[in-house]
Amino acid sequence: HYELVKLNLYNPAVKEYLKEVITGWVKEFDIDGLRLDVAYCLDLNFLKELHGHCKWLKNDFWLMGETLHGDYNRWMNPEMLDSVTNYECYKGLFSSFNDLNMFEIAHSLNRQFGKEQWCLYTGKLLYSFVDNHDVSRIATMLNNKRQLPVIYPLLFTMPGIPGVYYGSEYGIEGDKHQGDDALRVEYNEEKFKADGVADLTGEIAALCKLRTSSKALAHGDYTPLQLLNRQFSFRRDCDGETVVTLLNIDDNPFDFNPGIGGEYTDVITGKKIDLSGSVHLDGCSAIVAVNK
């Protein structure tokens, strides 16, 4: 991006200016955090200084950075950023659906958040997404549009902090190859309703309600249950709360066998559900069940 100014983050005057700007935003607007663009290009010592200044302003000030590849712990650690963008799982989300290969995203989730000592980010809070202002919308990326109601339950219940890009709750499309304007359209709810390929607002609202109240989804353990090419299930657990996610990306129905006792409620439909035996899912559907 040659049109953007490149600041010298080794220059003390530049660093002080940036700190003053952040201080001004906190004092004037009481902001709670910052999202740092291309954080992977920033000097690591500057990130440490920024961290110290922001936490001095507010001890719960949130610092999130844009990262793409590599070990995210390089930027996300107690001295630098609180969270980073999880592009590894972003890729795994849409390509697992398109290739009908849920092993890909399951591998990434276990690699990042599993219980083994070698897992990379267990207990950390990465920013999860299926689209944003830099990539094609998920309704464009998915080959089978029927899978749209399945990918958001996965996004909201996998470890991490889920984000929804405006307009995608209506399934609107946008192709990155057509430029930024195609991805960053004017907010027009009526047009979104008319142009979208799937109205996901009810489902996403239910998932948001669960996510904001659920300790299991915010901080719980991640345990895979059943994995096939076109089906995937897992559970999240914390302080007696359990959330079980069942995903069927195939066009045909499938019967899961979670083998989990207790009374559960499907948060999407509001219906009681028994997970102790066989659980039937229609083609391209999902169940998110909670025991509280």
In which residue ranges do the predicted regions lie?
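Substrate-binding/active-site clefts of carbohydrate-active enzymes
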Residues: 1-28, 50-56, 73-74
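The substrate-binding groove and active-site-proximal loops of carbohydrate-active enzymes
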Residues: 1-15, 32-41, 96-97, 134-144
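Soluble or luminal CAZymes and related metallo-dependent hydrolases
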Residues: 10-18, 42, 46, 101, ...
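Active-site groove signature of glycoside hydrolases
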Residues: 17-44, 128, 132
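Active-site-proximal helices and loops of the catalytic beta/alpha 8
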Residues: 27, 37-121, 154, 171-206, ...
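Structural preference for beta-strand elements that scaffold enzyme active sites
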Residues: 31-35, 62-64, 125-128, 162-163
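Substrate-binding clefts and catalytic carboxylate motifs of secreted carbohydrate-active enzymes
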Residues: 106-178, 192-199, 214-217, 232
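Carbohydrate-interacting/catalytic domains
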Residues: 159, 164, 168-292
